[in-house]
């Protein structure tokens, strides 16, 4: 009997992944995937993309972004032989479960989730103009989680409220109809985000402050050269602040030569080293770190049929999991068996 605990996580296909994804989620995903304790489900959440990107040209872009996200995942080590990788929109059971769950939670409860307003603000949507789909985004996310019967969900602090809503929905369903769903728990990694190269909040595509896993060596060097450091350090002889300085945050994470990093910090505090020297070494380490990832990514993108096969295989596996869950839901919910054949 399989005693492994299920974990579900994923990404919206809005473009290429960046170092913030690596620090905040991918590194943790690899540890979970390679642990004997967990079965991992990785969802490419294309339906979630539609909640804030519904224009025709944006929808058409999703297909290309699906391949990019998948190539990024595979290039960093997400393994389809160890994990289930699937496309959200190709799982019809998600739609049904989303609808059922929408009956089990109030609008006020959903609207109380802080990240919902943040999403609207980032998409330049006024609160009074929120679409039904965007309001229902957290419920759709609950359907993703509970369809897989995930017991753990790796999220940052800004998304903990989504998992708590999922727990409420699972609790409500189990109380009303009978035990089907686990109440998932938050699983946090060592780090949940990475500051952007501009020093203004976490790294993100929308903030234009990201270094992408696929950036060229020249682009990486240029982005690091422009990286925000200590604004009060006017010249190299001015003692600089290390704490909270993006330059040293990145060195701590990506430079494996810890003695060198500590030497840089000491000299920086004393005003005995130029920013450009510290930045040059960071660029070298980032280029070295990303080189094998970029090589594998290029190889995967050159074989779109192989990527398609990976996604199809994983989606078929998830369909089997989904069917088992929905059989239990139908039985507990009380749908008549005599009409079940109409669903096939």
Swiss-Prot record:
GO terms for molecular function: ATP binding; tryptophan-tRNA ligase activity. Keywords: Aminoacyl-tRNA synthetase, ATP-binding, Cytoplasm, Ligase, Nucleotide-binding, Protein biosynthesis. InterPro entries: aa-tRNA-synth_Ic, Rossmann-like_a/b/a_fold, Trp-tRNA-ligase, Trp-tRNA-ligase_bac-type, Trp-tRNA_synthetase. It is an enzyme of class 6 (ligase). Pfam families: tRNA-synt_1b. GO terms for biological process: tryptophanyl-tRNA aminoacylation. One of its GO terms (cellular component) is cytosol. PANTHER family: TRYPTOPHAN--TRNA LIGASE, MITOCHONDRIAL. Homodimer. NCBIfam families: trpS. Catalyzes the attachment of tryptophan to tRNA(Trp). This is Tryptophan--tRNA ligase. It comes from Chlamydia pneumoniae.
